[in-house]
């Protein structure tokens, strides 16, 4: 056969100079005082006599191209390029190398398969005959051209001679053999071409071991041991590859059946659990079937399963002294070592195939070194692997029950930090994912400069954590296949033809037809079971997503006995109520007793229904805040409407108070409702249904599961509050307090002036809120401390520890940072909100008198509890006083009392007008329970503020309120409605308008203020300031309603709207597209809304439904704004009592 010269100059490459890369691969032998040479490599033959391994050829040949990365055949014409952009820095690459791609990837014109793990285009299967000569020859010549094209200086004669020799060898034998130099070149170029490898910057520093003369499995084992010894290098990892004989006819392959040279076993235990690495279950069982003796540990190194010359595989145990393992520990958490984790130091891929010049090498194990996330994120945290994430999260004290706490992110970061720390401490080579990403970006720049492209698989190269923080995230990439290349292979045990049937592993596979029949039969049975079950529909309406989460939780519980489905109210048709058997509703209450926006449509349809043709059972759970008088109003409205329609209530309507034990209340109600449903519908085997532990684990409090330990460290107050509430807490100082009410008034409303520490604090806008973290009253705290049974040192810093679910170790409870019991009761825990029913149930165990215990148990019933709660509104101290036999431990208080929440106040100043200050308008709250006959109670925050002295610190943070700000267009007219302390945000409005007028020359539109109070000589807040704003033209008009003028009828803000401002309101809202703002308590807001709707309905002749839609549109357009607060009490003092609770006051 003549040499096909037409192939000679097919390969074209591109010029480019590359800077010499630092050898961090440890392949270079470093003599002290000598300058390392980049071409010097460690010769493994030097280990021959020490280890007794056979001699074999290594990559130290002298005829390797001087610079593999300088391919410099200049093209005569510039190929068409693809533009690649880095969206992080704007850098542009032009890829021309993709024209040399040798095969199509899996993606199609209408289908992207980039995220498929092992696509067909990247996988080579077995062969049953040699590669045809007509296929082999062009590929061989293509590779020879590529090899000789990589030299700095052309070697024409040698190039032509080699082409001639290869051609004749193929013609004579049907195949050809690579020289050592060509093999070294091929292995390195295959690494260079690997699109899924992030560490390719080291591609030229690969040590090549030539084991092509190997003939038996025993020899393979010795070569692999040599590889492991060299590459491990006592922890100073060196990248290496061992190449075994090439494929001939496909029937005499050399294969390594392991996916990695070193990997841990995974065992399926009798109880169904998995011990070890779940990813290796199948291969571990294969090893056992082949005669390996399992040890059933978590980290057992699997044996090598080696196939030589197509023979049946043989099993070889790796000598333990060859396997370097790293024990995991954390730089901060001592308990991390208790997890008993470790990992092997050498990541050596063993099951890939090297393709080069038409030749295939199905056994070519190679290694680099680890990137930390491969172990810390994938091996340890993947759910299908060791899956330690939640255990670490619990030990860290994170809120693993809620995704919004970001516990997964925090835990995986610490696990990754532990891996890096452990490897570095034991001097084992590892690279963090940020450094790896940076190195790849450098490699990519080099490649585009050197050869006009760099194949890269973005999905694989972006690390599994940090995302856009790494530079590779922002880099566009092209993915294509070049030759030489490393391909995936089909697992050998799936295609191997066994010669000794005795060695064949026991077949466990189920035939496909049998499997299909089994699945079909099971699905039929399940359909029958589900069809026979009672249908349960779970409806939800939500603004924040909380109700939906609880609805799905409820459906999961009911799915143990019912055929459940979850539906949002906006997707539910009211006429389908006729088909229901069991209806469960979970909904929040929004605004002034309204339903959430996604429940509006169903509410209208439901409340227009007159009767049901078919009745059903139902139960309702409402979420809300007891600060508002319309607490869970929408849930109760649904309950009443369904009852009136004839449906039967399955369980009393549940209430979840966001201020007190909402989750506990839901779990208790869910279990109660589930059991009632099982009884009502006579569910088969209802007594055998095991309710999930998470619904019942909080029902009791076991002292032996908690303990207090002394802690030498404690956080300062701001850091502690930031940790507890996940807020950016800063300190302000009290400048002054001024009582805005006159001496004639028995009440107190404060103008609170706070100053920033430092030159300037966080920015804020008019209408936004300041959240303040108050302290509980000293008398309440001391009273509780005196009744705690194990509190000898209330000022000693302690840490609460909780016994893990397994009962094997203690973990720190991160709900509270280390603190003293006094500090916790003062600043961190809510001791004024009445205990929940569940808390009373837990308290009952500490009562030493039986009558007290029985009474506490009785209060766990909803009717008893509600009467007791709303009559007494007891603080925790009053509960201890009512039941004096209670002996409560400190751990109970730290673990069970609710967190003291911040109090929000509308900011009453403009930052432009008073740059270094924040002003608040605060009503000081005092009231008596039991119709004025009970003990005197004080608002937590208002009382705390009233007792502050100048320069006292105030921990706080700014909360943005995007829906309650001045119009973007200052020319739009506004109506501001705010009686009492509802005036607070409007003071910031007029200060901002004053500043804009004086310093920016901006003239605002009409701003009409409607204010309300009792008497002009008692509580007309900011009266003189309002008058000044009118004189300066900032306020257009001020209208005031007085409700306590002697001899005159009570006038409220809604009366002014109806009698004096009807035309102005209609003009602003309808004619001029202006804005209306309402700030105050919910009752006032409801009355104002009712008045406005009547006014607009009369002006436009609208029906009730039409006017509701009109105001819904106003809110959607963000022209009707409400800032509503609650804390209006049904247990207020009798009329005339000087301690009567002011409406709408924040506590």
UniProtKB/Swiss-Prot annotation:
<dbReference type="GO" id="GO:0042802">
    <property type="term" value="F:identical protein binding"/>
</dbReference>
<dbReference type="Pfam" id="PF02898">
    <property type="entry name" value="NO_synthase"/>
</dbReference>
<dbReference type="GO" id="GO:0010181">
    <property type="term" value="F:FMN binding"/>
</dbReference>
<dbReference type="GO" id="GO:0030863">
    <property type="term" value="C:cortical cytoskeleton"/>
</dbReference>
<feature type="binding site">
    <location>
        <position position="1044"/>
    </location>
    <ligand>
        <name>NADP(+)</name>
    </ligand>
</feature>
<dbReference type="GO" id="GO:0001974">
    <property type="term" value="P:blood vessel remodeling"/>
</dbReference>
<dbReference type="Pfam" id="PF00175">
    <property type="entry name" value="NAD_binding_1"/>
</dbReference>
<keyword id="KW-0862">Zinc</keyword>
<feature type="binding site">
    <location>
        <position position="589"/>
    </location>
    <ligand>
        <name>FMN</name>
    </ligand>
</feature>
<dbReference type="GO" id="GO:0071285">
    <property type="term" value="P:cellular response to lithium ion"/>
</dbReference>
<dbReference type="GO" id="GO:0042127">
    <property type="term" value="P:regulation of cell population proliferation"/>
</dbReference>
<dbReference type="GO" id="GO:0005829">
    <property type="term" value="C:cytosol"/>
</dbReference>
<feature type="binding site">
    <location>
        <position position="769"/>
    </location>
    <ligand>
        <name>FAD</name>
    </ligand>
</feature>
<dbReference type="GO" id="GO:0007623">
    <property type="term" value="P:circadian rhythm"/>
</dbReference>
<dbReference type="GO" id="GO:0006801">
    <property type="term" value="P:superoxide metabolic process"/>
</dbReference>
<dbReference type="GO" id="GO:0050829">
    <property type="term" value="P:defense response to Gram-negative bacterium"/>
</dbReference>
<dbReference type="GO" id="GO:0034612">
    <property type="term" value="P:response to tumor necrosis factor"/>
</dbReference>
<comment type="similarity">
    <text>Belongs to the NOS family.</text>
</comment>
<feature type="binding site">
    <location>
        <position position="747"/>
    </location>
    <ligand>
        <name>NADP(+)</name>
    </ligand>
</feature>
<dbReference type="GO" id="GO:0090649">
    <property type="term" value="P:response to oxygen-glucose deprivation"/>
</dbReference>
<dbReference type="InterPro" id="IPR001094">
    <property type="entry name" value="Flavdoxin-like"/>
</dbReference>
<dbReference type="GO" id="GO:0006809">
    <property type="term" value="P:nitric oxide biosynthetic process"/>
</dbReference>
<dbReference type="GO" id="GO:0009725">
    <property type="term" value="P:response to hormone"/>
</dbReference>
<feature type="binding site">
    <location>
        <position position="115"/>
    </location>
    <ligand>
        <name>(6R)-L-erythro-5,6,7,8-tetrahydrobiopterin</name>
    </ligand>
</feature>
<dbReference type="GO" id="GO:0042177">
    <property type="term" value="P:negative regulation of protein catabolic process"/>
</dbReference>
<feature type="binding site">
    <location>
        <position position="369"/>
    </location>
    <ligand>
        <name>L-arginine</name>
    </ligand>
</feature>
<feature type="binding site">
    <location>
        <position position="1054"/>
    </location>
    <ligand>
        <name>NADP(+)</name>
    </ligand>
</feature>
<feature type="binding site">
    <location>
        <position position="632"/>
    </location>
    <ligand>
        <name>FMN</name>
    </ligand>
</feature>
<dbReference type="GO" id="GO:0050796">
    <property type="term" value="P:regulation of insulin secretion"/>
</dbReference>
<feature type="binding site">
    <location>
        <position position="662"/>
    </location>
    <ligand>
        <name>FMN</name>
    </ligand>
</feature>
<dbReference type="GO" id="GO:0007199">
    <property type="term" value="P:G protein-coupled receptor signaling pathway coupled to cGMP nucleotide second messenger"/>
</dbReference>
<feature type="binding site">
    <location>
        <position position="544"/>
    </location>
    <ligand>
        <name>FMN</name>
    </ligand>
</feature>
<comment type="function">
    <text>Produces nitric oxide (NO) which is a messenger molecule with diverse functions throughout the body. In macrophages, NO mediates tumoricidal and bactericidal actions. Also has nitrosylase activity and mediates cysteine S-nitrosylation of cytoplasmic target proteins such PTGS2/COX2. As component of the iNOS-S100A8/9 transnitrosylase complex involved in the selective inflammatory stimulus-dependent S-nitrosylation of GAPDH implicated in regulation of the GAIT complex activity and probably multiple targets including ANXA5, EZR, MSN and VIM.</text>
</comment>
<keyword id="KW-0285">Flavoprotein</keyword>
<dbReference type="GO" id="GO:0043065">
    <property type="term" value="P:positive regulation of apoptotic process"/>
</dbReference>
<feature type="binding site">
    <location>
        <position position="1087"/>
    </location>
    <ligand>
        <name>NADP(+)</name>
    </ligand>
</feature>
<feature type="binding site">
    <location>
        <position position="543"/>
    </location>
    <ligand>
        <name>FMN</name>
    </ligand>
</feature>
<keyword id="KW-0408">Iron</keyword>
<dbReference type="GO" id="GO:0005516">
    <property type="term" value="F:calmodulin binding"/>
</dbReference>
<dbReference type="GO" id="GO:0019934">
    <property type="term" value="P:cGMP-mediated signaling"/>
</dbReference>
<feature type="binding site" description="axial binding residue">
    <location>
        <position position="197"/>
    </location>
    <ligand>
        <name>heme b</name>
    </ligand>
</feature>
<feature type="binding site">
    <location>
        <position position="923"/>
    </location>
    <ligand>
        <name>FAD</name>
    </ligand>
</feature>
């Amino acid at each position: 056969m003549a040499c096909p010269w037409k192939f000679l100059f097919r390969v074209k490459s591109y010029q480019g100079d590359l800077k010499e890369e630092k050898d961090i691969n440890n392949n270079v032998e470093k003599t002290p005082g000598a300058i390392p040479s980049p071409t010097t490599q460690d010769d493994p033959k030097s280990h021959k006599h020490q280890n007794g391994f056979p001699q074999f050829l290594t990559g130290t040949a002298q005829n390797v191209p001087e610079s593999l990365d300088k391919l410099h055949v200049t093209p005569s014409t510039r190929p068409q390029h693809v533009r690649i952009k880095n969206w992080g820095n704007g850098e542009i690459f032009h890829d021309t190398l993709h024209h040399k791609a040798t095969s199509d990837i899996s993606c199609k014109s209408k289908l992207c398969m980039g995220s498929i793990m092992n696509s067909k285009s990247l996988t080579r299967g077995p062969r049953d005959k040699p590669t045809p000569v007509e296929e082999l020859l062009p590929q061989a010549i293509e590779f020879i051209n590529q090899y000789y094209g990589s030299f700095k200086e052309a070697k024409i004669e040698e190039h032509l001679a080699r082409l001639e020799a290869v051609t004749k060898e193929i013609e004579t034998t049907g195949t050809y053999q690579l020289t050592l130099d060509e093999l070294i070149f091929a292995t390195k170029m295959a690494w260079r071409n690997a699109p899924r490898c992030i560490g390719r910057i080291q591609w030229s520093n690969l040590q090549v071991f030539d084991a092509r003369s190997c003939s038996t499995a025993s020899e393979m084992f010795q070569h692999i041991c040599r590889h492991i010894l060299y590459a491990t290098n006592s922890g100073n990892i060196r990248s290496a590859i061992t190449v075994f004989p090439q494929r001939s006819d496909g029937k005499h392959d050399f294969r390594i059946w392991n996916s990695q040279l070193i990997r841990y076993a995974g065992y399926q235990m009798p109880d169904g659990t998995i011990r070890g690495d779940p990813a290796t279950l199948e291969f571990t069982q294969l090893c056992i079937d082949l005669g390996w003796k399992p040890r059933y540990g978590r980290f057992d190194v699997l044996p090598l399963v080696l196939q030589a010359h197509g023979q049946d595989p043989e099993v070889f145990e790796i000598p333990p002294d060859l396997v370097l393992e790293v024990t995991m520990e954390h730089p901060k958490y001592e308990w991390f070592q208790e997890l008993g984790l470790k990992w092997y130091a050498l990541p050596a891929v063993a099951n890939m195939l090297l393709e080069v010049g038409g030749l295939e090498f199905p056994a070519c194990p190679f290694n680099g070194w680890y990137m930390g996330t491969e172990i810390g994120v994938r091996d340890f945290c993947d759910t299908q692997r060791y899956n330690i994430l939640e255990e670490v999260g619990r030990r860290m004290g994170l809120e693993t029950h809620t995704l919004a706490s970001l516990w997964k992110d925090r835990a995986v970061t610490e696990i990754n930090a532990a891996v890096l720390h452990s490897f570095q401490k034991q001097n084992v080579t590892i690279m963090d994912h940020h450094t790896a990403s940076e190195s790849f970006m450098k490699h990519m720049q080099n490649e585009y400069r050197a050869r006009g492209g760099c194949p890269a698989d973005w999905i694989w190269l972006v690390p599994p954590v940090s995302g856009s923080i790494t530079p590779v995230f922002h880099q566009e990439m092209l993915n294509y296949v070049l030759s030489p290349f490393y391909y995936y292979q089909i697992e050998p045990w799936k295609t191997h033809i066994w010669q000794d049937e005795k060695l064949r592993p026991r077949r466990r596979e189920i035939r496909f037809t049998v499997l299909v029949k089994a699945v079909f039969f099971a699905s039929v049975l399940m359909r029958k079971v589900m069809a026979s079950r009672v249908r349960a529909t779970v409806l939800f309406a939500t603004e924040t997503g909380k109700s939906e989460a609880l609805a799905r939780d409820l459906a999961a519980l009911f799915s143990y006995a019912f055929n459940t489905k979850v539906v949002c109210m906006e997707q539910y048709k009211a006429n389908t109520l006729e088909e229901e058997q069991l209806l469960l509703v979970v909904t929040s209450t929004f605004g002034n007793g309204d339903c959430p926006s996604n429940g509006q449509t169903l509410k209208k349809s439901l409340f227009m229904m007159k009767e049901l043709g078919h009745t059903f059972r139902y139960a309702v759970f409402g979420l809300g805040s007891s600060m508002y008088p319309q607490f869970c109003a929408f849930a109760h409205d649904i309950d009443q409407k369904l009852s009136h329609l004839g449906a039967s209530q399955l369980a009393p309507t549940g209430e979840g108070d966001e201020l007190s034990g909402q989750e506990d209340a839901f779990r208790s109600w869910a279990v109660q409702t589930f059991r009632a449903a099982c009884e009502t519908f006579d569910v088969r085997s209802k007594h055998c249904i095991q309710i999930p532990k998470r619904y019942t684990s909080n029902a009791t409090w076991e002292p032996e599961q908690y303990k207090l330990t002394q802690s030498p460290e404690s956080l300062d107050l701001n850091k502690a509050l930031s940790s507890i509430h996940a807020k950016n807490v800063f300190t302000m100082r009290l400048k002054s307090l001024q009582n805005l009410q006159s001496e004639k008034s028995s009440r107190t409303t404060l103008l609170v002036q706070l100053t920033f520490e430092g030159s300037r604090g966080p920015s804020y806008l008019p209408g936004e809120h300041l959240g303040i973290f108050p302290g509980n009253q000293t008398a309440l705290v001391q009273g509780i401390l005196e009744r705690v049974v194990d509190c000898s040192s209330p000022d000693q810093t302690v840490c609460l520890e909780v016994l893990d679910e397994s009962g094997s170790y203690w973990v720190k409870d991160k709900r509270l940072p280390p603190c003293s019991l006094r500090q916790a009761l003062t600043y961190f825990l809510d001791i004024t909100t009445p205990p929940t029913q569940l808390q009373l149930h837990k308290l009952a165990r500490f009562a030493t008198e039986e009558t007290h215990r029985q009474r506490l148990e009785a209060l766990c019933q909803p009717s008893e509890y509600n009467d007791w709660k709303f009559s007494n509104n007891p603080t925790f101290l009053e509960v201890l006083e009512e039941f004096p036999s209670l002996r409560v431990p400190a751990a109970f208080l730290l673990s069970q009392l609710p967190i003291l929440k911040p109090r929000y106040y509308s900011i009453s100043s403009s930052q432009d007008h008073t740059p270094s200050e924040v002003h608040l308008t605060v009503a000081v709250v005092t009231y008596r329970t039991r119709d004025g006959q009970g003990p005197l109670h004080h608002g937590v925050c208002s009382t705390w503020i009233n007792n502050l002295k100048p320069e006292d610190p105030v921990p706080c943070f700014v909360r943005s309120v995007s829906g309650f700000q001045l119009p973007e267009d200052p020319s739009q007219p506004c109506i501001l409605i705010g009686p009492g302390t509802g005036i607070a945000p409007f003071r910031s409005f007029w200060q901002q308008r004053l500043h804009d007028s004086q310093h920016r020359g901006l003239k605002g539109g009409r701003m009409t203020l409607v204010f309300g109070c009792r008497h002009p000589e008692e509580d007309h807040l900011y009266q003189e300031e309002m008058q000044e704003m009118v004189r300066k033209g900032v306020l257009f008009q001020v209208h005031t309603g007085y409700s306590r003028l002697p001899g005159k009828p009570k006038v409220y803000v809604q009366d002014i709207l109806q009698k004096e401002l009807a035309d102005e309101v209609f003009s602003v809202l309808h004619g001029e597209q202006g804005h209306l703002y309402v700030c105050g308590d919910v009752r006032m807001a409801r009355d104002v809304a009712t008045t406005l709707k009547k006014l607009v309905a009369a002006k436009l002749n609208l029906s009730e439904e039409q006017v509701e839609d009109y105001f819904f549109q106003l809110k959607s357009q963000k022209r009707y704004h409400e800032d509503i607060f609650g804390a209006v009490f049904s247990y207020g003092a009798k009329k005339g009592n000087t301690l009567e609770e002011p409406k709408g006051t924040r506590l």
